[in-house]
Amino acid sequence: MRLIEVLEPGLFTTVQDVGREGYGPLGVSPSGAADAVSLRIGNRLLGNAEGEAGLEMTLLGGTFALPDGAVLALAGSDFGATLEGKPVEMWTAFEAAPGQVLRFGPTRSGARCYLCVRGGVEVQLFLDSASTHILSGLGGHKGRALKKGDVLTIGLANRNEQKRTGKNAYSTVGAGTVGKRRLSARALKELQPRKVLRVTPGPQSDWFSEAAKKIFQESTYRVAEESNRMGIRLQGGVIPAPAGGEMISEGVSLGAVQVPEGGQPIILFVEQQTTGGYPKIANVISADFHSLGQLRPRDEIRFERVEWDTARTLLAKQEKLMASEELMREL
């Protein structure tokens, strides 16, 4: 049994996989990696199944001892990681010898860095997922963010071809043996997080006046300090909310842009409530969800409307790249 010992947890570090889809009718939001594209790539670099659990660090990383050694990969934002004092490259599989210590600092770019390990982080599944759901205190490691002194178990690498294949699991694309791999320059460029988020019309978009839609599409918004995994709160152009910003509650989706009475939009995120009573002017497209996961407080964003067919085409293009041999190269 191989272990990860938490010497310092960082600001907010949790165990996350790709989430628990399909439980919205039971009131359980998907949770999972805020930037699932990065987590999936980190796992591919290691030969893991794409949906394997890793550690999601937010804004400030932790310090981890590897008493038994491990094969690792870092994905997402650069947190200035060092292994025994030597810099570690992002987006590249590397090996830590038994007893070595991996340290992270503050972010140098986006919001989240993913520490992936060959074999994955092994925890008790909750509703078919290893993801930590902070608001309910379930899943992950004891239902909470990591603390100093926590000890995590690394799974067996040779079990990757027998990963769960239920509704919450990505395929075992990439599972198997692995050499030293690096994300390709093309993939790094095409999957770069965006600050202009593409959106399709929301369920109540026709409730909003043309003037309100113009404000939404032409304003620059700043990510508020109060943002979290439940919702990304924005500050900027005030959108006149129809019906006083209230409506009969209905089911909501990841990436929905709600407009409450105050007129400041809220983007529903991975630990969103499953129903909501605010009108929704738009929905961030699936191909841009990973960009949401890299937004930091005070980052500035804009919105760009696209048609449904465009949104589907962009997602299909992204998934084609994720599944292709051009995603990474052998070193």
Walk through the language-model features, giving the residues of each.
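Conserved "landmark" site that anchors the functional core of diverse proteins
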Residues: 1-331
